[in-house]
Amino acid sequence: MRSIPVVALCAVVAASLAVGCTSQAPITRAASAPAPAVAAASENAALETAVDGFIEGMFQHYPTFAANAGKHEFDGKLPDYSPAGLKADADWLHAQRARFAAFGDDQLDESGRFHRDYVLAVIDGRLFWLEESGFPYSNPAFYTDDLSPSMYLTRPYAPLAQRMAAFVTYQEALPRAIAQIKGNLKLPLPASYITLGVNSFGGYASFFSKDVPAIFAGVGDAALQARFKASNAAAIKATRDMADWLKAQQPHATQDYALGAAKFSRMLYATERVDLPLDRLKAIGESDLKRNLAALKAACDQFAPGKSLGACVAREAADKPVGGAVEGARAQLATLRQFIVDKNLVSIPGTEQAKAEEAPPFNRWNFAYIEIPGPYEKNLPSVYYIAPPDPSWSRADQQAYVPGKAALLFVSSHEVWPGHFLQFLHANRAHWKFGQLFVGYAFAEGWAHYAEEMMFDAGVGGATPEVHIGQLTNALLRDVRYLSAIGLHTGGMTVAESERMFREQAFQDPGNARQQAARGTYDPAYLNYTMGKLMIMQLRQDWIAAHPGPDALKAFHDQFLSYGGPPIPLVRGQMLGGKAQAKLWTAPAAAAAH
């Protein structure tokens, strides 16, 4: 996955879109008819100038965003996390929001309205996480991904010596940034937030100490090596001290992680323009969980007749990939790509490849994720990272953490073909630079999760019962995330109750269940996997009904992916005409019941 939404490169929102209104210029007074078009063209041009200014402002306020996008003049720089710096970010975003909101519907053509609403969406999402969520003052996840130096270490965008210089600049900036973060956190903190922070900052300290020096050991610049040595020692101390400070807060930890119903609903609207009532959203999630559990029972009746669902899933999980998860994933990628080509499912717009590697110690909070070069980079590899089990776990838990081959097939589908990697191949070729830069949480994760079920339906892996179980365990994981997010933040659910649901309803091993339940507290938007998937499924159903044909599925996928990454309701308005609205798919029987 692309990371926690509050710190990801993606901004995740969209304003309502009023298109497809079918009103036309009057047929009389033909001589004056071109005037509105001329005015719209002028305002569209002004809007695009404002968009260019917004992008440049984003680079200035969020230099890690810029560097990850491929603007390497920002290499090594970190944001200003001081209270004054956060206020300056918020003030700038509010001013930008006012600027774009001033472009009225009557001043813009359809394309201009879409672009304006997409920009307003990004701004609203940033403002929610920055101001309304309270996360800058409680949640280490607001910061930890921003601090990742992976780009300098793993992305060959420049010679190693140049990347080392950027990394040294980053290391030199790190102690100040960490001091600002520590100053922002208001005690006491929720227990799961503390654990995340301890693991993240402790992971950074370990990585800086044990792994980074060897990466740059061959660079022969003595002065640069001296700077590296000094800044490396300071970075190790700063990250280790931060982990120790957070660990010292554990006796005072709280369980005050819930956003509350009002703020959670605001999050859904501000970040995804989903305005459905929470009870309706919960019912849809429960329906999808029930659908997938029924499908799992049917598959298990063939794969492990007479066994319980848990025993059936355990049998699938026991068939481990040869050589471990990373080697297994590497073997799957070429097969998945060829399957997409053979089945003509979606266009592959380029020859780029993704490689599978073990995740670094500082970023192992989820089993798998992918790092993809930004739109300003050219001809660089993407890396599909897989986290090993926590060495502090029991041997049994460590072994259980590695998925079976069938389940891993759909992790690889999610992360690479045709999930995140393919989606970003399309996004990086979007006709509008803004769409290349800003890809939303529900769009990205919804597409990747949608891709899993779509690939099974197309027959990947022979669509055997074992393969179906692999797909369904991934789907059940996301269903329980969806329900946990709602429960943890609006329904009084405890972390222990969420963990039990992951084990009993999604059949997760103990280690994954612990990770996933904790993640729900500090990543409340992780319902976006299932929510995004169900919005895409409903849009596909509606679009293909209006555009039938033998290649309709591929045409749908290509058009959906062409927009970059707006909130899906906004894409729905573009593809179907009419207003932007959130519509989630439910199985036909369930839909009738609702």
What residue ranges belong to the model's regions?
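Bacterial N-terminal signal peptides that target proteins for export
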Residues: M1-L9
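Core hydrophobic alpha-helical transmembrane segments of single-pass membrane proteins
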Residues: A11-A15
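C-terminal motif of bacterial Sec signal peptides marking the signal peptidase cleavage site
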Residues: L17-G20
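N-terminal maturation segment of proteins
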Residues: T22-H594
